[in-house]
Amino acid sequence: MKKFMGKDFLLQTETAQELYHEHASKMPIIDYHCHLVPQMVADDYQFKSITEIWLGGDHYKWRAMRSNGVEERFCTGKDTSDWEKFEKWAETVPYTLRNPLYHWTHLELKTAFGIDKILNPKTAREIYDECNDKLASPEYSARGMMRRYHVEVVCTTDDPIDSLEYHIKTRESGFEIKMLPTWRPDKVMAVEIPSDFRAYVEKLSEISEVDISDFDDMITALRKRHDYFADQGCKLSDHGIEEFYAEEYTDGEIKAIFNKIYGGSELTKEEVLKFKSAMLIILGEMDWEKGWTQQFHYGAIRNNNSRMFKLLGPDTGFDSIGEFMTAKAMSKFLDRLNSKGRLTKTILYNLNPCANEMIATMIGNFQDGSIPGKIQFGSGWWFLDQKDGMEKQLNALSLLGLLSRFVGMLTDSRSFLSYPRHEYFRRTLCNLLGRDVESGEIPASEMDRVCQMVKDISYFNAKNFFQF
């Protein structure tokens, strides 16, 4: 029986152990998509408690606690003490067996704090105090955590109207780890509520210093902000969309739709889809002009619980996997850009695992030989960011594409304790490849190639692909 969370955790063969310990584990981390708060990095924030860094904003844990019968005040309540919240999480952890949270929890305790104990009600106070004692020291600050995990680059997620002041402050401080912005223009496509859209466009007008009175003005303002992001080192965009949009439209129609929505009128469903379709193309062309990589996270049904949405807002644990027949629209969107010669590097992330093989074959339609893996099948995202989800994504890509050209893992996280997800991914990758070598499905004579493949997927592919 193997020791839980031992040095060979998830590594079931000697070859897997060699691949991980001698190669994958030695690679720095490039976290090319995350949701860290830039101000925390700029200010080198010192966390007040393990509850703040671990449970604050972690909707994965909140979902588990609610499922375990824990009252909401222990998840998101403002009048509940840090210890009370941690205690309720410790009571929940034993019930997360076979849930990835059990692995994440103990891997984070081990790698960040050197704690090998199992978290449960009996060990809760001891672990709480030990973590808090360490968090009070400078090496456990926001920057200290990034250094601890050998992070080389992080890309945050930023709105076009963000000032990026904290990226600038961090860079000018001489911090050795790069923190770069990512362009996330979701709100400029959110035309369902006229008042919200108009309020956003007014903010865009203010920060861009462009007087916006029509659609062309809005695009001018967006281009100005796009240029500004590029000046601050941005190399990626990201789009959170329910599905792909590829309706037929004319320029005149889009200008008329803008005038209608900006004037405060509700749009028809058809008009909403046309506007979103046009914006995806325009934004994709902007990214192509600068050589950026565009990312698409699609397939979530968000804010399902309307009562809790009113109480807590978005991103609080009430989202789920959607069912969208999106293959044709995705193909049409990519083809429109490709037909113009304006399809930039692209990463597609699906939330429904039923789409794995669809995406793995879709990316092959638009590889053009300009660079290896120009169109990528993104790593398992959100609910798929776990062992089974990772393996299914890796297997689909292996069978239908080129795994060796994959740009690898990202945290997609708001937490400075989430970097062990890279380790978890690397162990999973090495286990798959090691098993194939030992079963004779990959020749042992190609071991040097397999070793390089592991290092490439862990680090070098991303470094070269994004030109960090």
PLM features: residue spans?
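Metal-cofactor-binding active-site regions of metalloenzymes
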Residues: 1-290, 342-344, 348-353, 357-360, ...
